[in-house]
């Protein structure tokens, strides 16, 4: 199994993280020392399946106090490789110092460490592909029965976002590459650009950015995660890949004017 190795510092929300389409193409490693403490339930999914290539933990909880199944049973049912017994915090420090790594996980015992390193070096970065097209909805669907009309670009949206918006709005979820004409037919009061995986500056996303450039002149727009980056590109900004991603809760945010750091 090959993938981009990333880490998450949250203490809870392991199911939400693993089913988040933003992690498509990646191997997710948790820094919290034990994962699966409260079991696994279908209600915690952010999409229809686990989106990561694999999962790495220091230890998984054998006897959770609740849940329909334990962490290992869940990964097996979803056919996702899991690796236990790794000092994930030490590996996270290495990742933080060297930058995001490409990784290979082997289960057959036939691949030597040297062969694994070679395969990792030859591996393409997941963001070289158009991951948005892979995780986006293939057809339009609607949620919510009252309130303003929100047209939501699904670039890998978490279902909790759709659910929360639908509580007080009428939400139309559309595929990643919906055209300007198709968007206008949905009669939006607001355009919402979702989270998602990959590179916002990917060549196949150029037309999307151009569409947003036109739409922001006519409609109120909101972007979150990847959507925020796409909106930035549409407004003339630039994006670049961080040395390592910031994934987890309580992210520090620095006010560059006052030099004050806030915890979100």
Region roles according to the model:
Residues 190, 194-263:
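Cysteine-nucleophile active-site neighborhood
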Residues 1-163, 167-181, 185-186:
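RNA-binding accessory domains that recognize and position tRNA/RNA substrates
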